[in-house]
Every structure is written in C-alpha cells, then in structure tokens.
C-alpha cells in the first residue's frame, strides 16, 4: 500500500486503458472507499453502478458526447445520486437549506424555488452528493495501480435511462 500523499501525487486522468480485467476483490475495495466517504448531513443518498457490459459502456460513451474512451475502459463506475429532494419541499429550518441560505443568500434560494423546471433544480441541489465518494474511489483505484477519468460532459437523463 502507498502512503496517502503518494497516492494523491500519482493520480492522473487517464483515457486509454489496458484490457486486463479488474479482480473482483480489488473492485470491491475501491467501491468500499466510496461507501466510507462522508455525505452532507449524513444523507448517504449516493450509490454506484459498476458497468462491465460492452453495449452499456458504448451507450454511456454516446451519452457523454461520443467520448469513445469510455467504452474502452474495463469497468465504468457510475456515481449516482437520488434527486428526489426538492428544496421547495424542505422545511425552513432544514439544516441543508439553512447552510445554503448562508452560503448563497436568500435571494438565490428564492430564485431557485420559483424556477419552473423542478428536475433541473433537483439536479443542481443534489449534484455534489457523488463527488466526494468519487474522489475516494479514484484514490483507492490509484492505490491499486489503476486510474480513470471523470466524465464532465454527460447527458445525465440519458445516462440514467441507460443504467436503469
């Protein structure tokens, strides 16, 4: 095992992969790192999808603006979150709402509450939930001599359809 700072220094975005399969015990440890990460308000409203199926990886590559490297990865780990929570439905004393009112200001939250596309608001509100576990997953992968790349451009609605 590497020291933490060595793992951090070695982490890189990689878009070309060996075809070697990732052993299940390694994959399970990488996923455990994501599960052990903190979540805002201990919401734990994130989950991970492990994709090995070639057809599904190809569909995800298309949903990501035809980034073909995605389809060549031996495994794609999808970082997912529930978007059931709508800030419009939260009580005024909800801790997350109070924190974000302090962070962004009441005018911003009022604007978000009036925004007609509630699905877009929910996506924005819950967007960060899988990011911390995602970084834990990346660092655990590096510790096993693996790497990958964040997918920044992604049609999340289409990806959700593919993964379901």
Regions found by a protein language model. Name each.
Residues 1-164:
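Acidic, surface-exposed loops and disordered segments
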């Amino acid at each position: 095992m590497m020291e933490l700072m060595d793992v951090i220094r070695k982490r890189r975005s990689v878009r070309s992969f060996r075809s070697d399969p990732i052993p299940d015990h390694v994959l399970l440890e990488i996923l455990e790192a994501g599960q052990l990460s903190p979540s805002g308000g201990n919401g734990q409203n994130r989950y991970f999808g492990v994709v090995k199926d070639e057809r599904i990886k190809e569909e995800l590559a298309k949903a990501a603006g035809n980034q073909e490297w995605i389809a060549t990865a031996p495994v794609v780990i999808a970082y997912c979150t529930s978007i059931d929570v709508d800030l419009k439905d939260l009580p005024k004393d909800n801790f997350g709402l109070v924190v974000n009112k302090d962070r962004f200001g009441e005018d911003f939250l009022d604007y978000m509450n009036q925004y007609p596309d509630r699905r877009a608001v929910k996506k924005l509100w819950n967007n960060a939930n899988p990011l911390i576990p995602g970084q834990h997953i990346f660092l655990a992968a590096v510790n096993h001599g693996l790497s990958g790349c964040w997918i920044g451009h992604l049609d999340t609605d289409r990806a959700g359809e593919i993964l379901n």
